[in-house]
Structure formats: structure tokens, C-alpha cells
Amino acid sequence: MAKLRQAAFLSAILSLPLTSAGQAADLIGFWDTQQKGGNSFNELTPDKAYFEALAGTGATWVRLTFSKWKGEGRDFLLGNADNYQGLPQEDVAKLRKALDAAHSAGLKVVIVPLSLPGARWSQQNDGTFDDRLWSDPAYADQAVRFWSDVAAEFKDHPAIAAYNIVNEPAPEKTTGLAENGAMSDLVAWQEEQVDGPRDLVLFYNRVIAAIRKEDTATPVMVDAGYYANPRSLAAWPDRLNDERVLYAFHMYEPYEATSSGNMKREEPYRYPGVTTQYGGEALSWRKADVVAHIDKAFDWAEEQGLAPTRVVAGEFGCMRRWQDCGTYLKDVIDAVDARGGHWAFYAFREEWEGMDYELPLSLKPGRFYWMMEEGKSGDIPRDGKLMELLKEELNG
């Protein structure tokens, strides 16, 4: 917020409570210029040293999920995704401590659950996709109450830069719709879901309305449908009702090449050049295709009258040992930077080594996990060339 010096009455604005309109403008103001950061998807609660290390890369924000942490109940902060009954206070204290640590390191935080009532994260659900939230309205009601409680509890915390309602929602998944099918199919599917339990736009508007009753200031980040696919965002008929919303997509396409499964092939797919089914036809991926995929989100935002600084590449990445990972990361960043959006790489010092770009190519996965199990995490080499590439982009 600009310093006010001209008249005595203006100074009173600075004393307005956090949830005032004046402070709301200030909070969204963080996102008025491009911000670059990283994801924290750790099983152990990150401490100050972790956040300081992330800040040391040049990151200004962290997308922090808490759902993998050990909580009072089965599901951290939810208690139980089968029946939400309120925020467990031990979990609240643990999350607040992590937020304090991030704040002391100078990072802004976007908090994001992997699970919501009726939508337990598949990796904590025996590998099964939990579709209840998208088929039973009772769970949507619970999700609304959950976020109302979170907003009431954390609205005054200085570290929080946005509430990210849920990671990678996929109300489309069980309906037979192809994830990267024809754009006309995505649009038609969205039209068919209007006012139903799978209407993600309706769901988000409901949740945000509940948040605003408790917290008028904090921005909200929303992942697009079908695992935060920019094409699913482009199928939305309208922007959301609230003005302090950031629209997020994730970028791993072509997934067949960037994901762990590719590393198990005798000859891993290469980029550029890998061919996948996309938009109803075969596509040989090159930089222009990466750009076109990402541009779907920015073009939609422009059509909706939104600034490019309201669009976020909330995750992107590739397997660190894939020989084309550096080329891919650079192409993704170039595409987002060209449009002026925000980004956060996946991920920083996760317990999984697959996308830990600090690790050098010479460090084999087995060696990494052995060192972690032996309590030698401090001795793990962290001079990977991919992180040097990211640092250049973070500080550029």
C-alpha cells in the first residue's frame, strides 16, 4: 500500500483492520507483479532452515501443502475426509508454526490441501480416485465449512498470500471425458455440468463466498479442472464472481515424457519430438506446442478481461534424470514469462528425489533414499545443474 502523506484523514486508512477493503487491495497487490517460487510437498513439516534455503534460490513464494503431514486424525487439518467436523487444533498449531517459519524467511505462502471432504488424495486412499465430492452435494457443503473455518483461523497471518482451494481437482475423471480430447468436447462437457455437483465454477464460487464472510482480504487461487489442465480452464464459460482470484494451471505435458514412467522405458521418450494424443489427434511436441498449451490459460484470461498476473503456473516439472529435463523446464518458463504470469516449480527438497533439481545427475535414486534413511540428509550433494538453471530464472 502506498504511503499516505497528504492529509490527516488518509492516515486513518492505515489503521483499518486486516479484512478491510484497503488491506484487500494490498494483499492482491503482491500478485500485481510477476512472482516466482517453488512447491513444498513434504511429509515432514518444513522448518525455518528449509524456507530459508528456498528463499536463497531467489523464490518469493512457496505453494505449501500440508496434507502429507501427520495430524491428529487420518487427514491433516480435515480430521477425516469422510466426515469433516472442524479443524483439529494440534494441526492448526503445526500449520501456524510452519507459516511463522516461512514468514521469518521472507517468503509468501499459498496454502493448498491435497484432500477435501469427499475427495481424499488418491495416494492416501489406496490409489483410488475419490469422486464423492463431485457426486454427493453433502461433501461440497462440508468443503465449504472447512474453508470457512480455515479463513477464520488464518486470515490474520502475514505470510499467507492466497488460499488455494484444492490441488488438481478432477470432477471430469469418472465421466468418460478424455483429458486432452477435442476442445469442443471439453466445452460441451462443461455446459452439461452447469449447476450440478461437477460444476467446478459453481463449487469455487460457493467456497469463495464462504471465505469472504470470514476474510474479505486474502486472495484465492483456483486450480483448473482435470488436474489443473489449462485446456479445462479455457472451457469455463466465465471467470469467477470474486475479483481477488488467481487462476492456476499445472504443466507436465507431454506427461508421457516428463513423468516417472518414462524413465522405466528402455529408450525414454525425447523432447522435443515425443508424439502423444492431444486434441483428438497425434501431436509431436516441440516448444511451439508447449507454448500453445500454456497459452490456453492466458488467452482465456485475456478474453475474460483478466490481467496476465492473475494466471499462475502453479506446478511444472520433469524427472531430474531425464536427459531433456533442462530443455523442457526452460521452454515452460519461457512460455509463462512471455505472457507475464506467475510460476512455481515442482518441487523443493521433497522426500521423493524424482523432481529434486538440486540433486546432481551422479546421485542415483537408491543412494538418495539410503542417505535419507540413515539420517544423512545433510550430506546429500546439492549442486545439480538443473537447480542452477532454475536459480537463473528465479533471479532473472
Give the ranges of each region predicted by the language model:
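Bacterial N-terminal signal peptides that target proteins for export
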Residues: 1-9
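Bacterial N-terminal signal peptides
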Residues: 8-17
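N-terminal carbohydrate-binding accessory modules
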Residues: 23-85, 300-301
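Acidic-and-aromatic substrate-binding clefts and catalytic sites of carbohydrate-active enzymes
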Residues: 39-49, 69-72, 86-89, 170-172, ...
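An active-site-proximal structural segment forming one wall of the substrate-binding cleft
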Residues: 43, 50-59, 82-113, 124-165, ...
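Surface-exposed, active-site-proximal loop segments in enzymatic domains
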Residues: 70-90, 119-137, 173-189, 356-364
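Active-site region of glycoside hydrolase catalytic domains
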Residues: 123, 131-283, 295-319, 338-344
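Aromatic-rich peripheral "rim/lid" segments of glycoside hydrolase catalytic domains that contact
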Residues: 323-396
